Amino acid sequence: MLDARAIQKPWLSPWWAALVRCAEKGGHTGLDIVERVSAGRATGWPTASGYLVLERTEDRKLRIWLGVGRDVRRWCGEAERLVSDFARSVDCRALLIEGRRGWRRILPHWTPKGEDLELDLTR
């Protein structure tokens, strides 16, 4: 569970429509986002020119569940650093993201784990 004071509501973001489209590509809906955030399992995360939805997993990992925006290569490094710090602050030991080819190119230092990529935060 995430601290309610730290949770940002993605549906208040100008990126909301893009987040819903991204969720739908993965078989989810806007309602799924609202329910997970409202339950304290997920939070929105604004970036320089995009938006992420982060979800805490049962095994102490923080999953970058949804991501939209422009010029991801420009802001990805800073977002990774900030999200990693946040993950540690909520007692998570790794970051996860779906291992699509594009992410594999942008995040070559992440470890493939099945269909996902993982960044160990315990080192």
PLM feature spans:
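Short intrinsically disordered terminal tails
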Residues: 1, 122-123
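Short amphipathic alpha-helix that is part of the acyltransferase structural core
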Residues: 1-28
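Generic structural motif
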Residues: 2-7, 52, 110-112
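Active-site rim helix/loop that mediates acceptor-substrate recognition in acyltransferases
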Residues: 21-42
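Conserved donor-binding loop and adjoining core beta-sheet/short helix segment
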Residues: 38-74
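Short secondary-structure junctions
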Residues: 43, 109-114
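Acyl-donor binding region in acyl/amide transferases
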Residues: 59-109
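Conserved catalytic-core motifs of GNAT/GCN5-like acyltransferases
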Residues: 98, 112-122
